[in-house]
Curated annotation (Swiss-Prot):
NCBIfam families: rplM_bact
One GO cellular component, as annotated: cytosolic large ribosomal subunit
Lineage: Bacteria, Bacillati, Bacillota, Clostridia, Eubacteriales
Protein name: Large ribosomal subunit protein uL13
Any GO BP annotation: translation
Amino acid sequence: MKSYIAKAEQIERKWYVVDAAGKPLGRVASQVASVLRGKHKPIFTPHVDTGDFVIVINSEKVLLTGKKLDQKMLRHHSLYPGGLKETPYREALNKKPEFVFQEAVRRMLPKGVLGRKMLKKLKVYRGTEHNNEAQKPEVLELKY
């Protein structure tokens, strides 16, 4: 029996919408990353982008458990000596919740060209409104 390898022209992409309100950030992000990779499909192939598009709404209402809002830091570096910038997640979620969610998903995807291609299929919005109604997205039920 031969192993099945998905080809780019055989892949049918769907659009899903996920409501992140009141759900833990890591749990939602891990399931979104799985759908972006295509691991929910029987034709999943690790080196081919078989994933679907995902729209995340209410990104500002995502939960962080424990004391993570105050203790966990969002870090980036300017590449200059002493250029480490740290922002508590409470402040980052108030200013740019879309970025916080996108970074959580990005870190769960493969590093490299394929991961960047997968991340382009993620659309994150603040609030319940999004501009992808024309794609007729289905509601994605989260497992937990």
